[in-house]
From Swiss-Prot:
The keyword Transmembrane applies. Disulfide bonds: none annotated. Residues 116-455 form the PTS EIIC type-1 domain. The gene is ybbF. It comes from Bacillus subtilis (strain 168). GO terms for cellular component: plasma membrane. This is Putative PTS system EIIBC component YbbF. PANTHER family: PHOSPHOTRANSFERASE SYSTEM TRANSPORT PROTEIN, PTS SYSTEM N-ACETYLMURAMIC ACID-SPECIFIC EIIBC COMPONENT. The active site is at 30 (phosphocysteine intermediate).
């Protein structure tokens, strides 16, 4: 069976175990997970989904999150989309709409909705950030090693290719933010341009000249969300024949004025507070701060709250050019790898060893969900010892102030995104987390009596 057929077969089985296409309210995907919102949750068989070949784990939260891994999730989602796109009967749609409204009311807590919006804005940008970050990082490493002159045309071309995204990132954030809040994507792009336009330097307000980029991605978010709501409000009063001319023009004019008077200063204040606050925590807290941040990241992953950190990482890179937080948090996955390997060594249960063997390769490559949801979390104590191991590695990263130049998956691949002069330090910290997670779990974290579910 070809790979495409495998993806189609897996998508078909997932759809069946989620209650069929008439039970699918909505679906999307991130880097590793297919996220499905069923109309009727009772029709989705999470246990059966976990047993499917190709499924690395299942998380039952406000959405049904099926962990498939990087790369695979794109193909399976595409196949899944084709399967659910067939037209449904009107009676099914009517009943489904009522059920969807009930589910939305149940899940529509402000905090969950906020995280969902944030994820939808920033997660689609991660592949571009990884690509640009890798090209930039590798180019800097080659130049630093003396293999290429910084003034050579090859180095200049590679630098331009890698840096372009970070120059115009505000435009992409504006597009996604406006679309997410019901506006026109092109107007969202204009909201981003309002912040990064070099001509801003000619504007002087309240006795001070404006700085291009001031407000950062926070300012872009404010402007893009504002222009989306402004557009919707104005459209209510404009005749359809004039809508295409009046609505975008007035929306842009109002948003531009409000952006320069309010959003840029406010966004700049918040951006400075986030950046200086985190840097102060790491500077003052040092090893202790690194330990706490590293040890508490995995519980955030379990609850899905880690998605809220994506704009923080981006803002750090946008503001100071690097991210000292990501290497610390990346130790969470490394602690899991060490803990899972300790269980693998100690256990005599074939089913458990098979589950660990399947999850370790992806864990080493920065995809920790299979080990978290398939091994350490169900066992209980190994999850805690993994967190402690992660904290020890996080303390190491904080002490040496290791930072990345872009965001991406953790584990070994993140070493390509670390500042070239700190790659060895990052890898050392990674292996410290592996070792700490292993030793703590081997000594205190596991007995075969804990694994009755793997009999």
């Amino acid at each position: 069976m070809s790979k495409e057929n495998n993806y189609h077969h897996l998508a078909q089985k997932i759809l069946e175990l989620c209650g069929g296409k008439s039970n699918i309210s909505s679906y999307t995907h991130c880097m590793t997970r297919l996220r499905i919102t069923p109309y009727d949750e009772s029709k989705a068989d999470a246990q059966a989904l976990r047993k499917l070949d190709g499924v690395l784990g299942v998380v039952e939260a406000e959405t049904l999150q099926i962990i498939l891994g990087t790369g695979v999730v794109n193909h399976v989602t595409a196949a899944f989309s084709k399967l659910v796109s067939a037209e449904e009967g009107a009676d099914v749609k009517e009943a489904a709409a009522k059920k969807k409204a009930d589910i939305n009311r149940k899940n529509a807590t402000p905090f969950k909705l906020f995280l969902r919006k944030i994820a939808s804005i920033f997660i689609p940008l991660i592949p571009a950030l990884v690509a640009s970050g890798l090209i930039t990082g590798i180019t800097k490493a080659i130049i630093q090693a003396g293999w290429l002159s910084a003034d050579s045309q090859i180095a200049i071309i590679l630098t331009v290719i890698g840096s372009g995204l970070f120059t115009y990132l505000g435009i992409l954030v504006g597009i996604n933010a406006s679309k997410e809040f019901g506006g026109t994507p092109a107007l969202g792009a204009l909201a981003g341009i309002l912040i990064i336009n070099p001509e801003i330097a000619k504007i002087s307000l309240f006795g001070e000249e404006l700085l291009p980029g001031r407000g950062g991605l926070i300012g872009v978010l404010f402007a893009a969300i504002f222009i989306a709501y402004t557009e919707q409000f104005i459209r209510r009063f404009i005749p359809q024949s004039l809508d295409i001319i009046v609505t975008p023009t007035v929306s842009l004019l109002i948003t531009g004025i409000v952006t320069y008077v309010v959003f840029m200063p406010l966004g700049g204040f918040i951006s400075d507070a986030i950046t200086s606050g985190l840097l102060s925590i790491l500077d003052i807290g040092g090893i202790a701060a690194g330990f706490i941040l590293g040890a508490t990241f995995l519980p955030l992953v379990v609850t899905g709250l880690h998605q809220g950190l994506t704009p923080v990482h981006m803002e750090l890179i946008n503001s100071i050019g690097n991210d000292p937080l990501l290497p610390i948090l990346a130790m969470g996955g490394a602690g899991q790898v060490g803990a899972a390997f300790a269980v693998f060594v100690k256990t005599k249960k074939t089913t458990l060893r098979k589950a660990i063997a399947g999850g370790l390769p992806s864990g080493l490559l920065g995809i920790g969900e299979p080990l978290i949801f398939g091994v350490t979390l169900p066992l209980g104590r190994p999850f805690l010892t993994a967190c402690l191991g992660a904290g020890i590695g996080g303390a190491f990263q904080a002490y040496f102030q290791v930072a990345t130049i872009a965001i991406g998956v953790s584990g070994l691949p993140l070493s390509f995104l670390v500042l070239p002069s700190q790659i060895i330090l990052y890898i050392v910290g990674l292996f410290i987390s592996y070792a700490a997670g292993f030793l703590l779990t081997y000594a205190f974290g596991y007995k075969d009596e804990m694994a009755s579910q793997f009999d």
